Amino acid sequence: MRFMRVAVFGLCMIPAAGVAAAQDAPSVEAQQRTLRTVTAFAQEYLDRIPNFTCTRTTRHMVAPAATQKWHDQAVAAYELSYYAHDEHYRLLTVDGALVKRVPAKSMAEGWLELNGNFGWILKELFAPGVHPHFAWDGWQRVEGKRAMVFSYRISLEESHAKQAVCAGRFFFHSCKEKNYGFHGLLFIDAESMDILRVSDTPDNLPSNYAQGISTVDYGRVKVAGEEYLLPIADRIQTYNGKVLFRNDSTYTAYRKFSAESILKTDAP
C-alpha cells in the first residue's frame, strides 16, 4: 500500500465543546485575532516559500493490529526537493545502502509511502476558498513551548484534499485518487505565533485507503543565514486490514534549491 496527498485553500470559529476546553481559554476575540494572524502568515508563506532541498529520513515500521507490537521494516533516506510549489523525491539509501528502489524484502509485509507534508496541510487550512471550522481545544506544550491548541474540521464538500492508492513498485505511480474531508489539531506558539504542529485525520475514505492520523512538526531552520519556518519531523500511523503501518520522519540538511524569494519567520 502506498499513500500520497495532493492539494490546493477562511476562518470560522465554533464554540469549544466541554468545560475543560473552556478553562483558562483566551477570549473569543483573542482566539479570532490569533487565527487571523496565523492565517495571514500562512498565506504569505505559501505564496512566497523559497525552493529548498533537504534530506528526509524515514523509519518504516509495521505491526499486527492484534498485538500492536512494532518492528522495523527499513530506514530510508530520500532527497526532497521543493520547487514550483511541489515536492520531488529521490530515494538515496535503504538501511544505509545506495539503492534506486526499495528492496522487495523490505516491502514483504506492505509498504507505506507519504508525500505532501512539506506544504500540504498549511495550504489546505489557510489558502483562500475553504472555510475550516475552528474551535478552542486547550493548552499544551510542544518541545517545551506553551501552545494554543485549536481543533478544526474541513468538510468533504469544501475539501480539495486527495489521497491515492498506488499499485506499482515505483513511488507515486499507477495511483487511484479519492477526495476526502478531514479534521485535526492546530498548535500555535503562544509567544511567537509560530505554527508548531498540525495533525490531520481523513474522513469519508473507503476502507482500502489509509485510515489514520498524520502529524507534522515545524521549527525555525537557518538556511544560508536566513531563518525559515519549515517541517522538522512528521509521523503517520495507519492500517490496512489487519496490519498497522507507521512512518517516523525527520527533515535535515536544508539548503536552498535555487535563488528565489525570501520568507522570514519573524513573529508578528
Regions found by a protein language model. Name each.
Residues 1-4:
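N-terminal secretory signal peptides that target proteins for export/translocation
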